[in-house]
Amino acid sequence: MWFLRETIFGELVEYFSGGTRQVDVEKLGVCTDNSNVELSSCPDSSFDDEKTNQVNSEGLIIVTWDGEDDPENPKNWPLWAKLVVTFDVCFLTFAVYMGSAIFTPGIQEIRETMHVGTVPVILGLTLFVEGYAVGPLIFSPLSEVPQIGRQKIYVLSLIVFICLQIPTALGSSLGVLLPMRFLAGVFGSPALSTGGASLADIWQPWLYPYFMCFWSLGAVGGPVLGPLLGAAMVVAKSWRWQFWLLMMISALVLVIITFFMPETSEWHLLYKRAKRLRELTGNPNYKTEAEIASSQLSKGQFAKQILVRPIILCVSEPIVLSLTIYIGLVYSILYLWFEAFPILFTTVYHFTTIENGLVYMGILVGSVLTVAFYFIYLRKVMIPKFVENKGKFPAEEILIISFPAAFFIPISLFWFGWTGRESVHWIVPIVGTLFYASGSFLLFQSMFQYLAAAYPKYVASVFAGNALFRSSMAAASPLYARAMFNNTGPSYAPVGWGSTILGVISCIMIPIPFLIYKWGLKLRSRSKYAT
């Protein structure tokens, strides 16, 4: 079965069995009897320059898809195969993202076990999220290398992620716990940095936004359900079982993606086709465009592309800088709430550890409701516009949905902060978090899609830089969250003024999508990176 053949399991079977994939050489127009004879000289060849491979000026045979309907092209896979891959990416993202928040219910027990203060233990959350920032700088560019692809990075990094949970669970000091948490964040990051790219590999542009929503739900569900599952482990067993559970869930994901997740990278699939043709014909001139481009990069240039370009884009491009700061703020609020929720619901409402884990469900409910609305918006507004204009319309129009979303964030913060008091039922502040879920979801969807449309040639670097700054901002937020809320009060609304500070900052950010909508085209015309 072709689906299993393209998975890691299929590749391992092929490697250890000594098998070689057969290529339909007549279909590709390959002359196999003499590797030095040009294709045009093969009288029985069905070669068609415009349909398949082309010979460039250097005599290299550029390997491409066999027309628009080539069945090996991921965009032409059957629907069931695309749905399986989508599920794999979403489940992988859910499991890895859960690793950050599953830690929080055990902070008190870890503090008591290791005889340290609260802030040093919170570093276990901070360093894990900081790993999200560092990982994409490494793994995102590697996933674009044709010889590597995405699949191997997913599997190998997840194996390391699983192994890191063992010393984390067995550790008896922060000297063990903290480095392991940071490394786990680094090796868990590929799903977060390239998951969207995997979906873009298989879905047509007008369908891609729909399935990005499901991936986003996986990204939301992980940190939302993490505290609940972590709390259950802390109550039933101990804080160490948070990491054993994370290891078991991740191991299940590893089994699934090993057997049921084929490679989706177009450049890697074409590279493997070119490699098979080289082996079959003995002609070394079969190359892909990506293979040629990557071979022209020196190690220094590749390192610069990985480490320097993302930072340059984030700092020098006004559009990227402003949206990165905005997204970083919204992302930070979620991790601030990992400290604010226990303060409010334990101090004011006297919730148990398990009940504290349940309060995050408001964010998940809000995200699901927003997805339903967003589907309607896509179907009625964006997709018809995309089809009518054949995908060619000002990128700034993608930001329209972010206009109301920008107001939802401060509304949520003021609502949550000042309704969290003993005289108000506990469900009321939770309802306030629904506005955050809706606002953050719509902001993330619109802003990331806009950045991809505005910087198509450098989208990997833009997203890597965004992940670096966004995750760094979020990583720092738990360290000052408890002090901010405890020191601002007041006692009858313990998260009131702290939420107000965040709400005011969010209000300052509201004009950003409006300004980019108005001036974005002019800014892009002056940029050497944007289109």
Curated annotation (Swiss-Prot):
Keyword Transcription in annotation: no
GO molecular function: fluconazole transmembrane transporter activity
Chief location bin: endoplasmic reticulum
Transmembrane segments: 83-103, 119-139, 158-178, 182-202, 214-234, 241-261, 325-345, 358-378, 398-418, 424-444, 496-516
Gene: mfs1
Domain of life: Eukaryota
Compartments, as annotated in UniProt: Endoplasmic reticulum; Membrane
Keyword terms: Endoplasmic reticulum, Glycoprotein, Membrane, Transmembrane, Transmembrane helix, Transport
A Gene Ontology cellular-component term: plasma membrane
Protein name in the entry: Transporter mfs1
Similarity-based family: Belongs to the major facilitator superfamily. CAR1 family.
Topology within the bilayer: Multi-pass membrane protein
Keyword Iron: no
InterPro entries reported for this sequence: MFS, MFS_dom, MFS_trans_sf
Organism: Schizosaccharomyces pombe (strain 972 / ATCC 24843)
